[in-house]
Amino acid sequence: MLDDPILDDIGTIRRQFTAHETLDGRIDQAFEAMKQIGFEALIYDYTPVPYDLDGAIMIPSLLKLRNISDDMHDYWFNRGYFRIDPVQQVALRTSAPFFWNYDPNADTLINRFMNDDTAPVTRYLSERDMSTGVTVPVHMPRGDYATVTGIRFGRNKDFERHALRYIADFNLLAHVFHETAYSLFDTRAKSVGTIRLTERERECLRHSAEGYSAKEISRIIDRSVPTVVMHLNAATKKLGARNRTQAVVRATHYRLLEDRPTHNWPPYNL
């Protein structure tokens, strides 16, 4: 563990990540850098849309772990722990990095979200000596977000002081890391849940969202009216909607009607 900040300028940090051509390689690089400032495990997740239509936290499309048991995937995905995790509750409400401690007597930001409903999360982390850490929320321009979390095992009383000393370094590291990681995301990582609309279904729904009838859409895309209706009905069914209007609302909420960019956001030039 170093006594002095270890991070260089943004360009140097970015080059350390982009030297690796795979997502896992860049995650490994982030973990190595995190270990130098005192962290012992890494959690990295990305969620294309923060909330579902009922206001519940969405399960992320990507969850990557380093030095953490793989059973966390099962608990956070299949058992829904991600939805009730107090750390995620805070991450959705702030853009600043924060220290957390699952000890109910600790005065950290997650404390007000800890209750009987979140007890399974507290128990899981406590049983694995993962009760303290720092999380960096990364909120992106279109509403999607990621969190980069560093964990320290055990209950070292000095860890909070140490973590807060290096929290600015970790914040910079996490943001530059996510920028380079995001550029390697595939379609699955950027998609919400299991809903997959074809390009033609998206096109028809997009025109429907603009107020066009099936007959008008048929002229715009140069296809027959029955073909347009078929695509709209297929999209409505995939979205679990009762009618075309609800299908448009759901598709818009889950960002399924957005044009998919063929390029990545330009890097920061700082």
What are the residue ranges of the model-derived segments?
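Regulatory input/activation interfaces that engage signals or partners
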Residues: 31-139, 153
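Short hydrophobic/glycine-rich mini-motifs in sensory/regulatory modules
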Residues: 138-149
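The N-cap/first-turn positions of alpha helices
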Residues: 200-204
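Hydrophobic residues on short alpha-helical segments
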Residues: 205-209, 236
